[in-house]
């Protein structure tokens, strides 16, 4: 507080838009998914949630938004650690999984791992296309002035644009 940094950040977001629905998409979804992909291990909850609280979001609203966005990016968080380390290490020596991969026509484990990653990305991208809209609807229903899902849905164009800005590159890279 004494340095005034939070006031500067708050003013910066207000200059972008005073609309909390857009702010939650920018902070929780776009920033949150970015830092999950780069740092992983729940970093969005540790960084984006306090940022939203500092900007004046109710604490519970910030926590709910931070947790909802954790649905899509987690499988490739920390530069793919859950897939590259978790799935690979956890399944590569399992005789049943090796037999299953062979049954599906994969002669190399790495090809099967890529297949798993692609399937996960497709499922998460399909669901992720609607996560920003869900976040805004939940925010306005439980924390908005009118307690209305409809208020959250009014920003659907930006919500879908933001979702696709994350999910399309997500699919391409996966």
Question: How would you label these PLM feature ranges?
Answer:
Residues 1-55:
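Membrane-embedded alpha-helical segments and adjacent helix-loop junctions characteristic
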Residues 55, 61-174:
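Membrane-core helix-loop-helix motifs of multi-pass transport proteins
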């Amino acid at each position: 507080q004494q340095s005034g940094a939070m006031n500067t950040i708050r003013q910066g977001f207000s200059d972008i838009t005073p609309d909390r629905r857009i702010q939650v998409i920018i902070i929780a979804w776009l920033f949150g998914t970015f830092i999950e992909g780069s740092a992983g291990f729940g970093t969005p909850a540790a960084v984006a949630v306090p940022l939203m609280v500092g900007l004046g979001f109710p604490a519970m609203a910030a926590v709910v938004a931070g947790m909802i966005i954790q649905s899509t990016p987690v499988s490739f968080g920390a530069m793919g650690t859950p897939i590259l380390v978790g799935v690979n290490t956890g399944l590569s020596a399992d005789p049943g999984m090796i037999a299953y991969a062979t049954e599906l026509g994969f002669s190399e484990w790495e090809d099967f791992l890529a297949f798993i990653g692609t399937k996960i990305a497709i499922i998460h991208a399909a669901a992720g296309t609607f996560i920003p809209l869900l976040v805004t609807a939940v925010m306005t229903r439980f924390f908005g002035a009118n307690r209305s899902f409809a208020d959250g849905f009014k920003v659907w164009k930006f919500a879908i644009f933001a979702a696709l800005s994350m999910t399309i590159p997500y699919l391409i890279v996966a």
